[in-house]
Amino acid sequence: MKPAPWSLNLSFARACLAALRCGRVVLLAVVPLFVQAQGEAQPLPVLTLSVLQFGTPHWELDHLKRHGLDKANGFDLKVRLVADLPASRLALSSGSVDGAVSDLLWAQARYEAGTLYRYLPFSSQIGEVLVNDSSPIRTLADLRGKRIGVAGGPDGLGWQLLQQAAAGQGIDLAREATVQYAAPPLLSQALRRGQVDALLTFWHFSARLRGEGGVRIAFGLADLIGTLGLDPDLPVLGYLFPQAWAIEHDDLLQRFSRALRETKDQLASQRDLWQEIRPLMRADNDAVFAALHDSFVEGIPQPLDAARIAALHRLLLLTGAEPEKLMPAALFQSEP
């Protein structure tokens, strides 16, 4: 026997009334599901960077990722670890990663060769000239006739700046000193053994040697930049991104820039956070750890503006770039 039509209408009315009475509950249940579905439909953009496993950029990227500063700024950071700098540059040039860290001179050389990279500052640390504690070397003039170990090769930024500063005092180091190029660890041993009188090396190798004791800074390259009439806080190391990619992913690059500034601010102001990074620093003792920490923080650069970009251009000119072939200001990433 079929139910009467009026009974069906009554059942429908009762259902509607019940729905209205619990509408608040229904909405509260449905809205989170809708938001969740929306979030699942729009995954965060991914930024992939190539860094050396024990390289100094890995320190800050580890902190950025560990504390969720990528997700907080609307992207997902993926770090690809490589064994050495050539491997990192190969990953960048082949397009297997979005970005990598290199120095200003390399970015300029790539530009002159027709490959454009966007340059986001990483550090203003270059290196230092170290001598043994008992060494009489204290000035550029004292390097005449001495054996100088140079990390980074003849085209490295540090060696270029050291020669420019010496030339300003009438000293031709390439002719008036004995120069030995080698890998930083080998040169560190050479200084300890007295096989070189002075060592020009990268800042983190310098910090490690000083932390171990027995050596001192004869002069820092940042100080030499000052003698050349330039701001010593210039970011000579940076994150590089292919320009075509940077234009297409401008919003993602801005998000990374914000997260990076937050990272640097936290690492500069909260020393206890460095205990999480210490395994990557390979700091065998507290003195080495302190020296590495202090040097990293000292190298955190100020944001780029027109004046600082112009100073970077002057630095490139000093190191041999031609005026008509300078990286344009548009390739230097300013902070949002």
What are these regions (language model features)?
Residues 246-321:
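Secondary-structure end/capping motifs
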Residues 104-105, 185-277:
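Pocket-lining segment of extracytoplasmic ligand-binding domains
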Residues 22-33:
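Bacterial N-terminal signal peptides
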Residues 37-41:
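Boundary at the C-terminal end of the N-terminal hydrophobic targeting segment
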Residues 42-172, 180-181, 197-203, 218:
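Short, glycine-/small- and polar/acidic-enriched structural segments
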Residues 1-18:
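N-terminal secretory signal peptides that target proteins for export/translocation
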Residues 72, 222-232, 297-306:
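Short, solvent-exposed loop/beta-turn-alpha elements that line the ligand-binding surface or hinge
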Residues 313-336:
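Conserved C-terminal helix/tail region of periplasmic/extracytoplasmic solute-binding proteins
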